[in-house]
A protein has these predicted regions:
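Charged mid-protein connector segments
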Residues: 95, 99-100, 124
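Extended, Lys/Arg-enriched charged tracts that mediate electrostatic binding to polyanionic substrates
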Residues: 101-113
């Protein structure tokens, strides 16, 4: 599956690049490897009954990625660039989107990582935004059914001023 890459160097985001390479070339001192300078999202593209492809919560995922970036002092990817990359990768991989009646979808993984080679705890100077996709089966294998769970809205799993509210690898 094709991936799209966008790099931020010298304070500006570069042009969208498309690649079929499944490997990233990183410096061993990249901040994503040592200081947690990484953020990701997860979206799905579904094929509708009418054959049209729909992407679930595109705008909301762009906003959440930006919120995560603010929270861990990473460069924020503009919403339009996020959407452009997602739409491009989905279009290039449309043939892998499962048929409507299967309950399956095309999983979309946007990933933003700090790539500067630096030692010391401070934000990266360079970033790479990558999007890759893979077909996945239904999330709920047995279909949708009710469960006897309680939702408690007053509880926060995150430590005060911690990173628990952000979509970063350290929380998984």
């Amino acid at each position: 599956s094709a991936a799209s890459d966008v790099y931020k160097r010298q304070g500006a985001w570069g042009e969208l690049e498309v690649s079929s390479d499944e490997h990233l070339n990183l410096h061993m001192a990249a901040t994503c490897l040592h200081y947690g300078q990484e953020a990701f999202e997860g979206l799905k593209a579904f094929r509708g009954k009418d054959g049209k492809v729909r992407i679930f919560r595109l705008e909301e995922n762009a906003a959440r990625l930006q919120s995560t970036c603010q929270g861990i002092l990473m460069a924020e990817l503009p919403t339009e660039r996020f959407k452009e990359a997602i739409l491009k990768v989905v279009k290039l991989n449309e043939r892998f989107i499962p048929p409507y009646d299967t309950g399956a979808s095309l999983y979309i993984r946007p990933l933003l990582i700090g790539t500067s080679a630096q030692v010391g705890v401070h934000p990266a100077n360079e970033y790479m935004f990558v999007v890759f996709v893979t077909p996945v089966g239904p999330y709920f294998k047995g279909g949708f059914s009710t469960n006897p769970y309680v939702i408690i809205r007053e509880y926060d799993r995150a430590a005060p001023h911690g990173t628990g509210i952000y979509k970063v690898g350290g929380n998984y």
